[in-house]
């Protein structure tokens, strides 16, 4: 004989949490807006304005993720209740187990939707840029920056995000001096915003003939792609624009023309670079877009006294502003803010970051 009361209580609990989320996420308004967006996208002339059409498509995906999930939860709970009644009437343990398994699946789906409440910031739903910068440690730090880039690219791929390498400056011997990656996908900035900070690597260096233990640092800085309509005042006199030959991977045209662009905002010291297009003009436009996004992020951080301003985050790539320690010869990676750690170092370096990211978001970092 199987015990049905715990399952009934779980159904009630999941139903109650679903209703709370329904209200919190404003399901009715989102369903109405989804119908409006679908109607707009069905108009034959919608692609006359490609940017608007793309924005509508992105909005539809975001709305569907909420509306359809809540619909599935509510219908699923009805189905599970029906299965449970059948199992009791027929005294059928197989049907009972099926109901329990379906309920567990619904609970996981609900937990994923509940997690979206962590993404309440104005730009959490936006695409984002990730700047990586090698710090203390010479070639070892430059190799570490390259390892971090691979880690984040793997993580993005595992979540179904698209990535573009905007800028990549090779190290003197190996690895990278710096790189900028654009990460494209729903809530990309929300997921990655707590990764800003210094990452410390401790290992026996493959670049040391004596095999000694080395400590090196590289920094990550995450900022959202801001809407072109956001009014960010940039005085042209505050900008220094340099052109140069691209030094990283980029196809046959790299190093043949000075198409890469570096923009420095002199008052703040902020720098953006782009080299991923043959056209200097397009690279300049992209670098300006990144500069606008960085200045916006700086302004937002200045307004929020609970966050470190960007100058602090970028100033000292060393001991002072670490967020995570990767001690490879002890097989231990630990987040210094949340205390979360793992001994499966290779999995993390292969992009398994969710445990660290989720803990930092839940901690309100």
Swiss-Prot record:
Compartment list: Cytoplasm
Main localization of the protein described in the UniProt heading: cytoplasm
Assigned keywords, A-Z: Cytoplasm, Methylation, Protein biosynthesis
Signal peptide positions (record): none
Entry-linked InterPro entries: PCRF, Pep_chain_release_fac_I, Pep_chain_release_fac_I_sf, PrfB
SUPFAM superfamilies: Release factor
Modifications made to the protein after synthesis: Methylated by PrmC. Methylation increases the termination efficiency of RF2.
Residues annotated as transmembrane: none
Family: Belongs to the prokaryotic/mitochondrial release factor family.
Function: Peptide chain release factor 2 directs the termination of translation in response to the peptide chain termination codons UGA and UAA.
Protein name: Peptide chain release factor 2
Organism per entry: Proteus mirabilis (strain HI4320)
Gene: prfB
